[in-house]
């Protein structure tokens, strides 16, 4: 029986004021990848400035569902959502 890793939904503030949403098992590692230009295509042209927040999920499936719901939010809704999230120590 395999043990699933904990997955995180994370939101990044990017240049131009945009907000990027993604999922990962390691937020600090993924943020570093985005900053190095090796993350998502979106963050290659809109450099990430900081992690706005993160929230843990017990499975990838649950994190993906939350990611989809978050990506459907407006920027104002994402900012309000981030105010409630676990703040990273990066």
UniProtKB/Swiss-Prot annotation:
Gene3D superfamilies: GIY-YIG endonuclease
Family indicated by similarity: Belongs to the UPF0213 family.
Protein name as it appears in the record: UPF0213 protein Reut_B5558
PROSITE patterns: GIY_YIG (PS50164)
InterPro entries per record: GIY-YIG_endonuc (IPR000305), GIY-YIG_endonuc_sf (IPR035901), UPF0213_domain (IPR050190)
CDD domains cross-referenced by the UniProt entry: GIY-YIG_UPF0213
Lineage: Bacteria, Pseudomonadati, Pseudomonadota, Betaproteobacteria, Burkholderiales
All copies of domain GIY-YIG, residue ranges: 5-80
Residues annotated as transmembrane: none
